[in-house]
A protein has these predicted regions:
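Sec-dependent signal peptide recognition
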Residues: 1-8
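Hydrophobic h-region of N-terminal signal peptides that target proteins for export
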Residues: 9-18
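N-terminal maturation segment of proteins
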Residues: 19-429
Length: 429
């Protein structure tokens, strides 16, 4: 009996996984159903699902307790560990194994949070997103504020002057759709020069209010998305390309289309029929979406397009465009101030009022926008690192491999390969 067991083990150990006999397929199916089960306890958890409808119906009907879900996920992780120890895998299968392991570990982390377990901001971001954003002292932001202070005209506090300066660049509500449509069309045109997308891909845009976010891509499967834009607060002219590229081309819409096309439809990997928001996938999704606007619209080219097309459409004088972007370039360096507000607040080191004031002082938010951001932090917690830290990781990954602004073909190739791959944050360093 021992001899037979040993022979079977050696046969298993020498196996190289093929597409039709991949033991991870059953784990992937169970993973999808457990993500759907968590979604019954957390309305924000399942960002997209386009797998078998009966799995969704089953999750609703059963409403598994969180303890049962956690136990089932632990079992899947044990099975994955066994596969890793006994099965010889090629590079693609190794990446799939790592991806499933990290995604399942993030499910456990989210379940622990839902069960009331406390983690620090950095512990949570590592457990959910596979990354920890750098920490900056208040002095870092004070230095940046001093650099910005001399650039912004007017009198009074910098935050007040910054708000007043930007008022001249607000898109009038009655021109918003025309400006966004133009930005989306140009982002699509540029993306399709380098990315092969299915002919039926498309998305629709809706304008909404009362949300904690500025825009959201709801991927529906079948190569289609719904993009919602929050018009509750003023939208500035620079946000047209930001949102068109981030939510659409080559951002979230393209990312999801490529995953569905290359990994679900081609490879039949069912784990890509669901997208759990609080997972390592999100750092790549948000980071690539933020960096995507730079890939599609390099700085000088973006300014030219905006001055010639978007500014006139919005009825904004393009004469002030250079100054506007000079100010925004410096202000963008304050991005990590939002992380510090979230980290301090969620770790109990800042009161809500102090965190909100921090956003006003160091992110230069209006009181209304700071309040909206606080609601985002309370809803999505350490998710905030995925935008700036994620973008920095993606930028460094692409550019360190030759994908620089002076080599757009190479930049697009590396960027698109990343969108279609299984790489997570720890694999970008």
């Amino acid at each position: 009996m021992f001899r037979m067991t040993l022979v079977l083990f050696l046969l298993c150990a020498s196996l190289t996984i093929g597409k039709d006999k991949d033991p991870m397929n059953s784990i992937a199916e169970a993973y999808v159903q457990l993500v759907l089960a968590v979604g019954q306890h957390d309305a924000d958890y399942v960002d997209a699902y386009y797998g078998p409808p009966e799995w969704q119906e089953k999750a609703r009907a059963e409403k598994k307790p969180l303890t049962e879900i956690q136990k089932a996920v632990d079992g899947l992780l044990s099975n994955l560990h066994q596969i890793g120890a006994t099965v010889r895998m090629d590079e693609k299968m190794t990446m799939r194994h790592t991806f499933l392991t990290r995604q399942l570990q993030s499910v456990v982390a989210r379940v622990r949070y839902l069960r009331g377990e406390k983690m620090s901001f950095d512990e949570e971001s590592l457990a959910l997103y596979d990354g920890v954003a750098p920490t900056y002292p208040e002095s870092h932001f004070k230095e940046l504020i001093r650099a910005l202070d001399g650039l912004v005209p007017g009198v009074g506090s910098l935050t007040a002057r910054y708000e007043e300066f930007r008022k001249g660049f607000i898109i009038p509500p009655d021109k918003l759709d025309a400006v966004f449509t133009s930005a989306i069309n140009e982002a699509r045109r540029r993306t399709k020069e380098y990315v092969t997308l299915p002919p039926d891909e498309d998305f629709t845009v809706e304008y909404v209010t009362g949300k904690s976010w500025s825009a959201y891509n709801w991927y529906k499967g079948g190569h289609r998305s719904l993009i919602q834009v929050n018009t509750q607060l003023p939208i500035y002219i620079d946000r047209a390309i930001d949102l068109a590229a981030h939510e659409g081309y080559p951002g979230h819409h393209v990312y999801n289309v490529l995953l569905e096309m290359n990994l679900l439809e081609k490879n039949k990997w069912m784990e890509f029929s669901v997208y759990p928001l609080f997972s390592p996938q999100s750092l790549i999704a948000e980071g690539s979406a933020n960096y995507g606007k730079v890939v599609a619209f390099p700085a000088s080219d973006r300014l030219r397009f905006e001055k010639e097309v978007l500014f006139p459409l919005a009825g904004i004088d393009p004469a002030g465009a250079e100054k506007y972007y000079q100010v925004l370039e410096v202000a963008a360096k304050l991005s990590y101030a939002g992380n510090e507000a979230a980290r301090g607040y969620l770790d109990g080191k800042l009161t809500r009022d102090r965190a909100r004031q921090w956003l006003i002082d160091y992110s230069l938010y209006s009181p209304e926008r700071a309040e909206q951001r606080m609601k985002f932090i309370e809803q999505y917690r350490s998710y905030v690192i995925n935008y700036n830290y994620g973008e920095d990781l993606v930028k460094n990954y692409v550019e360190s491999r030759g994908g620089t602004e002076d080599n757009p073909q190479k930049r697009w190739e590396i960027f698109v390969d990343l969108l279609s791959s299984l790489r997570l944050a720890s694999g970008l360093k």
